[in-house]
C-alpha cells in the first residue's frame, strides 16, 4: 500500500477512534457522577443510622417500595425483630420508620441504577465495535467488581441484623473501599481516553509519588470508614489536641494491642488524624518538588491544585470534629474525599499520557 493511502487509512482510523473515545468519555463521566451520588447517599444512610431499615435482600423485587399501609406495616414488623429497634429505637412510629427506610431504599435503588448505567452502554459500545481491545478486560473487570459489590453490601447489612445494633465496621470499610476502587478504575480509564499535554510525561519521580498519593488517599478513606462504623468521630471533638494532649493516653486499652487499631474508637480517630497529617505533608512536598523539577508544566499546576484540595478537605475534617459530626459537614467531608481520590488518579494518569493511537503498521495489519 502506498504511503499516501496508508496515511489516509490512518487518518480515518484516528477520526473514528476520537469519535468513539468521545462517546466513551461521556459515558464514563455519567458513571462517575452516579457513583459519586451513590457514595454520598450511602454516607447519609450511615450517618442517619438507616442502613438496617430494610432487613431483606431482594435484588429485583426490592426495587419497588411499599405501596400500601399493609406493606408498610409488614416492613416495619420485620424491622422490629432486629436488635437495633429493640435496643435503640423501640417505640419508633411508622412515620419515623419511613424516614430511615427511604434512605436505605434510595441507596439500593442507586446501586441498581449504576449497574444499568454501566452494563447497558458497555454492551452497546462493545457490540458496535467502539471498545478498544486494551479496554475490554479492565471494563469487564469493573463490571464484575460492581456485581460483587452488591453481595458485599448485603454481607455488610446482614452483620447488623443479629447480635448487633449496627453493621460491622470491617464490612462497612470493605464496602466503601470497593466502591472507591470502582470509582478510581473508571477515572483511570476516562483519563487515559482524554488528551494530555506531552510535557515531561516520562518524569519518573513525579509519577511514582503521584501513585503513592493515590494509595494514601484510598487508605485514608478506608480509615474514615472505620471512624464512621465505630462512631469514632464523637470520641474527641477538639483540635489539634485530643483529651488535652497530642497523644491521648487511652489508645491501647484493649488486648492484644493491635485490636485497638480497628475496634477502639479513640485509637481509630487518632490514626485517621495521623493519616490526614501524613497526606497533607506528602501533597505539600509533592507540590514543592514539582514546582522545582517541572516548573510551569501541567504536572506542577495539578500538584498545586492537589494541595489546595487537600487543604479544603483538612478544614472539612476539622469542622466535622468540632461540630460533633454534623451530617451536612460530614457528608461534605466524605464527598470531598471521593473528589480527592478521583483527582489523585487523574493526576497520576497524567504522567503516563493517553492510550496510544493506531499507527500505520497497525492499520496495515
Curated annotation (Swiss-Prot):
Spans through the membrane: 23-43, 109-129, 137-157, 172-192, 208-228, 274-294, 303-323, 327-347
Q: What is its EC number?
A: 1.17.99.9
Q: Which compartment or compartments is the protein found in?
A: Cell membrane
Q: What is this protein called?
A: Heme A synthase
Disulfide pattern: none
Q: Which organism's genome codes for this protein?
A: Agrobacterium fabrum (strain C58 / ATCC 33970) (Agrobacterium tumefaciens (strain C58))
Molecular function (GO) terms for this protein are:
metal ion binding; oxidoreductase activity, acting on NAD(P)H, heme protein as acceptor
Outline the subunit composition: Interacts with CtaB.
Q: What class of enzyme is it?
A: oxidoreductase
Q: What topology does it adopt in the membrane? A: Multi-pass membrane protein
Presence of keyword Membrane: yes
Q: Which reaction does it catalyse?
A: Fe(II)-heme o + 2 A + H2O = Fe(II)-heme a + 2 AH2
> Predominant location of this chain?
membrane
Q: In which pathway does it act?
A: Porphyrin-containing compound metabolism; heme A biosynthesis; heme A from heme O: step 1/1
Q: GO biological process annotations for this chain's record?
A: heme A biosynthetic process
Cofactor(s), names only, from the UniProt record: heme b
Q: InterPro entries in the record, alphabetically? A: COX15/CtaA_fam, HemeA_Synthase_type2
What protein family does this chain belong to? Answer: Belongs to the COX15/CtaA family. Type 2 subfamily.
Detail which positions bind heme.
272, 333
One Pfam annotation, family name? Answer: COX15-CtaA
Amino acid at each position: 500500500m502506498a504511503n499516501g493511502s496508508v496515511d489516509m487509512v490512518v487518518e480515518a482510523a484516528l477520526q473514528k477512534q476520537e469519535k468513539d473515545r468521545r462517546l466513551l468519555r461521556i459515558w464514563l463521566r455519567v458513571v462517575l457522577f452516579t457513583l459519586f451520588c451513590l457514595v454520598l447517599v450511602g454516607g447519609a444512610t450511615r450517618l442517619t443510622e438507616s442502613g438496617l431499615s430494610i432487613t431483606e435482600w431482594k435484588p429485583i423485587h426490592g426495587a419497588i417500595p411499599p405501596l400500601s399501609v399493609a406493606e408498610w406495616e409488614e416492613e416495619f414488623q420485620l424491622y422490629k425483630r432486629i436488635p437495633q429497634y429493640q435496643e435503640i429505637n423501640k417505640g419508633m412510629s411508622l412515620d419515623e420508620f419511613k424516614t430511615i427506610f427511604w434512605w436505605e431504599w434510595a441507596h439500593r435503588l442507586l446501586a441498581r441504577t449504576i449497574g444499568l448505567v454501566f452494563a447497558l452502554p458497555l454492551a452497546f459500545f462493545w457490540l458496535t465495535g467502539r471498545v478498544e481491545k486494551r479496554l475490554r478486560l479492565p471494563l469487564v473487570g469493573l463490571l464484575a467488581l460492581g456485581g460483587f459489590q452488591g453481595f458485599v453490601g448485603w454481607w455488610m447489612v446482614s452483620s447488623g441484623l443479629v447480635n448487633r445494633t449496627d453493621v460491622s465496621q470491617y464490612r462497612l470499610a470493605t464496602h466503601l473501599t470497593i466502591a472507591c476502587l470502582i470509582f478510581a478504575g473508571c477515572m483511570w480509564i476516562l483519563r487515559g481516553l482524554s488528551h494530555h499535554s506531552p510535557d515531561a510525561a516520562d518524569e519518573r519521580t513525579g509519577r511514582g509519588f503521584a501513585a503513592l498519593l493515590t494509595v494514601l488517599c484510598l487508605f485514608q478513606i478506608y480509615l474514615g470508614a472505620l471512624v464512621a462504623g465505630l462512631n469514632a468521630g464523637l470520641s474527641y471533638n477538639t483540635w489539634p489536641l485530643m483529651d488535652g494532649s497530642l497523644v491521648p493516653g487511652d489508645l491501647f486499652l484493649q488486648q492484644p494491642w493491635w485490636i485497638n487499631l480497628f475496634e477502639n474508637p479513640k485509637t481509630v480517630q487518632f490514626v485517621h488524624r495521623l493519616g490526614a497529617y501524613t497526606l497533607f505533608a506528602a501533597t505539600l512536598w509533592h507540590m514543592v518538588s514539582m514546582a522545582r523539577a517541572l516548573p510551569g508544566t501541567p504536572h506542577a499546576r495539578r500538584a498545586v491544585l492537589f494541595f489546595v484540595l487537600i487543604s479544603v478537605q483538612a478544614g472539612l475534617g476539622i469542622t466535622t470534629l468540632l461540630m460533633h459530626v454534623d451530617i451536612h459537614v460530614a457528608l461534605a467531608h466524605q464527598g470531598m474525599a471521593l473528589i480527592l481520590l478521583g483527582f489523585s488518579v487523574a493526576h497520576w494518569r497524567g504522567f503516563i499520557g493517553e492510550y496510544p493511537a493506531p499507527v500505520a503498521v497497525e492499520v496495515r495489519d
